[in-house]
A protein has these predicted regions:
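EAL-family c-di-GMP phosphodiesterase catalytic domain
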Residues: 66, 70, 95-102, 121-135, ...
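A short helix/loop element that forms part of the nucleotide-sugar donor recognition site in Leloir-type
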Residues: 105-109
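Surface-exposed amphipathic alpha-helices with a cationic face
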Residues: 77-81, 112-113, 140-150, 197-204
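Regulatory and interdomain segments flanking nucleotide-handling catalytic cores
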Residues: 60-63, 80, 139, 146, ...
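Extracytoplasmic ligand-binding site segments that recognize negatively charged/polar headgroups
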Residues: 1-61
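Short intrinsically disordered, low-complexity coil segments enriched in acidic
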Residues: 1-6, 11, 59-75, 184, ...
């Protein structure tokens, strides 16, 4: 239960870029930062956290942690607005446990109103295995309701599960987040380039946005741009950071964006 106790919560923010090299939005993740812990420790915590979602659900902590993440993400977005940073949206990952809550849409709308934010500024990230495996009508209904509300719907870790084109349409997915296993060394591996190119072509045909996870080198970033990937997220852009460091990062990133490979346009 220490995961969600007041006073030890902080937001670690993982920037993403897109659209002519400009920052498209920031993804907000909740985590616990122990006294003396480093940002690397925090990033590792987040990684382990999402690998152990079933453990959290069994302990009854998943939904409470989700509430903490959502509140802090919207609070951060409100702070960026006040600082004049013009961050379009935040993305928050929702677990199957949260998506089974029949009151989710109303609860989320209340939180948005609390911060005077439009639904279009929140993106809901759903793991591919949730979409592929669920037969729960409440989950289907909730995701559809959030899409109607105006929230974006991202399919996370695409390529690691068994989501079909039918399930993508059924869940009103607007964008796929391509798993980092397809991105690592893509600038060096011709077969991987073909596979990633096929995924991007499929997404384009279906009218879906694309985001590549794990772009960590300039070569990977440049290849993603050449293949026409819409957005990219990874250590090549920035490491996860506490929310209080984001304003300086945004200012510095925009100052140097002219030398960053252009993401979202195919090479001519």
């Amino acid at each position: 239960d220490d995961l969600v106790k007041p006073g030890i919560k902080v937001i670690v923010v993982n920037p993403k870029t897109g659209g002519n090299g400009r920052m498209a939005y920031l993804a907000a993740w909740g985590y616990v930062k122990k006294k003396g812990g480093s940002d690397a420790d925090a990033a590792e915590f987040v990684s382990k956290l999402y690998k152990n979602v079933p453990v959290l659900e069994d302990a009854g902590l998943s939904e409470r942690l989700g509430e903490v993440m959502l509140y802090n993400a919207l609070a951060a977005l409100s702070q960026w607005d006040k600082a004049g940073m013009a961050v379009p949206m935040v993305s928050v990952n929702f677990s199957a446990c949260e998506l089974r809550n029949p009151r989710l849409a109303g609860k989320l709308k209340w939180e948005l109103d609390r911060f005077n934010l439009e639904p279009q500024r929140l993106c809901i990230e759903v793991l591919e295995n949730v979409v592929a495996e669920t037969e729960n009508d409440v989950i289907v209904s909730n995701i559809a309701a959030l899409a109607r509300l105006g929230c974006g719907i991202d399919l996370d870790d695409f390529g690691t599960g068994h989501a079909s084109i039918t399930s993508i349409r059924r869940f009103a997915v607007g964008r796929i987040k391509i798993d980092r296993s397809f991105v690592t060394h893509v600038d060096e591996d011709r077969e991987q380039q073909k596979m990633l190119g096929a995924i991007l072509s499929m997404a384009e045909q279906l009218g879906l946005g694309t985001l590549a996870e794990g772009g960590e080198t300039a070569g990977e970033h440049a290849m993603l741009a050449q293949l026409g990937c819409g957005d990219v997220q990874g250590f090549g852009i920035a490491h996860p950071m506490p929310v209080e460091e984001t304003v300086d990062w945004i200012i510095n990133h925009r100052a140097r964006q002219s030398v960053v490979p252009r993401i979202g346009q195919r090479a001519r």
